[in-house]
Amino acid sequence: MPKVAVYNVKGEQVGEIELKDSVFGVPVNVPVMHEAVLNYLANQRQGTHSTKTRGEVRGGGRKPWRQKGTGRARQGSIRAPQWIKGGIVFGPKPRDYSYKLPKKVKRLALKSALSSKVRDNEIIVLDEFKLDQPKTKKVVELLKNFNVDSALIVVPEGEKNVELSARNIPGVKTLYANYLNTYDILKYDKFIITKDAVGIVEEVYA
C-alpha cells in the first residue's frame, strides 16, 4: 500500500495515510489513459457547426448568362461552389461526436491517473478543508502554502463553499470525490484531496 503524508491547510505535516493499492497503486497504463482523455474531450464537443451547400445558400436560381456565345465559361448558378458567396462542398454539418467507452476501461484509466499522481509525488492529502462561507482568499492561501499554481481540489460532495471559493482562480478546479474523471486528474499539476474524500474515492472506484 502506498503511504503518503497528510498535511493541514498551513502546509504542515500532521500524519500519514495508507492508500489502497487497488486504486492508488495500479500499474500506470498510458494508452488507456489516452483513450479516456480522447473520449472525455469528444463527449464535450457540441457538434453544432454547420455550413450551407449550394442548395441552401440564398439566391442563384437563375442562370447567370446564356450557355453559348459570350466567350465566358459556362455557369449554371452564382451559388455554385466556385463562386464568391457560393455553397460549401463537403463542409461540416451538425453531428454527435460522443461515444461510449467500456466502464472497465474508464475505471482502469482513472485508477492509472490516480496512481500516476502518487508515483510522481503530485498528490497532497489534507486532514480537512472546510469553509463556512465562500472565501477565495482561503483557497489562494492554501495554494500558496504548498507553492502550487495548478491544482485539482477534490472534496466530499456537498462542500459547495469550497467549490465556489475556487472557481474564479485560474488553473484551479474543484471536483466532488464521486465525480472524478481521468482528464481533470491529468490536466492539473497537483492533485489535492481531503482524507474524507480519499475514503470516498477508494469506496467508489476500488
From Swiss-Prot:
InterPro entries: Ribosomal_uL4, Ribosomal_uL4-like, Ribosomal_uL4_dom_sf
Similarity field: Belongs to the universal ribosomal protein uL4 family.
Entry-linked NCBIfam families: rplD_bact
Stretches with biased composition (Basic residues): 60-71
Organism for this UniProt entry: Thermoanaerobacter pseudethanolicus (strain ATCC 33223 / 39E)
Region feature Disordered, mapped onto this chain: 45-75
This protein's UniProt keywords: Ribonucleoprotein, Ribosomal protein, RNA-binding, rRNA-binding
GO biological process: translation
Described purpose of this protein according to its UniProt entry: One of the primary rRNA binding proteins, this protein initially binds near the 5'-end of the 23S rRNA. It is important during the early stages of 50S assembly. It makes multiple contacts with different domains of the 23S rRNA in the assembled 50S subunit and ribosome.
Domain of life: Bacteria
Protein name, per record: Large ribosomal subunit protein uL4
SUPFAM superfamilies: Ribosomal protein L4
Pfam families: Ribosomal_L4
GO molecular function, one term: rRNA binding
GO cellular component: ribonucleoprotein complex; ribosome
Subunit structure: Part of the 50S ribosomal subunit.
